[in-house]
């Protein structure tokens, strides 16, 4: 659903809206994961976040938390295992090859928090 579009909406606006909507879903998931592991780092590897660097600050700002690049292969499987180990109280290795760390912009994050509230409200209305 594209909410708020009008006759002045350009293809560039739509592309940005799609990027931000995806980032907000990542933020919703990230918020849930950070409740389980408050000190966890949000790490990404591969896929669109690695291949579309312009999307990285959008996701980082939506999350409101640092976003750490990983150069590890199979990083998603590794991350799931680390989360499980942490919940079991097992000491976690910190030896993965890190890429760049992005820091969120607080002003942008506040805007994205309000946008996530609107997105969640829209999802509830559409159920």
Where are the model-predicted features located?
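Glycine/Thr-rich phosphate-binding loops that ligate phosphate moieties of nucleotide
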Residues: 1-127
